[in-house]
Curated annotation (Swiss-Prot):
Gene3D superfamilies for the chain: P-loop containing nucleotide triphosphate hydrolases (3.40.50.300)
Keywords: ATP-binding, Cytoplasm, Kinase, Nucleotide-binding, Transferase
Subcellular location: Cytoplasm
Family to which this protein belongs: Belongs to the cytidylate kinase family. Type 1 subfamily.
UniProt key word Kinase: yes
Protein name as annotated: Cytidylate kinase
EC number: 2.7.4.25
Catalytic activity: CMP + ATP = CDP + ADP; dCMP + ATP = dCDP + ADP
InterPro entries the UniProt entry points to: Cytidylate_kin, Cytidylate_kinase_dom, P-loop_NTPase
Organism in which the protein naturally occurs: Alkaliphilus oremlandii (strain OhILAs)
CDD domains for the chain: CMPK
Amino acid sequence: MEFVQIAIDGPAGAGKSTIAKRIAERLNITYIDTGAMYRALTYKVLANNIDITNEKTIIELAQNSNIQFLQENIYLDGKMINEEIRSIEINKKVSHVAKIKEVREILVDAQRKIALGQDVIMDGRDIGTHVLPNATLKIFLTASVQERALRRYLELKKKGIEVDIDELEKDIMNRDNIDSQRAFAPLVKAQDAIIIDTTGLTIEDVVERIINLLKGV
């Protein structure tokens, strides 16, 4: 039996998680937010006051951490941390943790194991190129920096967090640079991925487009 695997890649704030989650609900398939796994590890790094440049200790932490998905909730060492991993500080630091080759190898292995034997939609930075290179459908979502910063601004404002939108733009550009320039599994479009620019589109517009593309595979 062949299982459906949908890979959604793209930069920070392009709408990957929101769209992937909606598609998972529509198709009744498992959703895996791989970015949440890197955020969970970053949360643990910061909680333990580990220097973000101390790669050796971060790798050891990754080797000794239990990061799990249960019913779309993210658990770190048995504790649900859905809200904790969405802080501004983690937004700024997660790319530094995610660029470490050994960390990516550990988490990619875990992601592939989760995908085995079931229909999945997975979003991240290197799903179509590295995690699920033989995915049924590969999508690369993008949007302007201004649009992505505005989305993040509104998301944080909804949670009662006041931020400067110009600072968010700078943070997004910095994350884009780190993600695309890292030596191992950088953020790049898979050759066979379909680009969708979500600037100005509603969530439902993008969801419908991807579901229609899947029907044509």
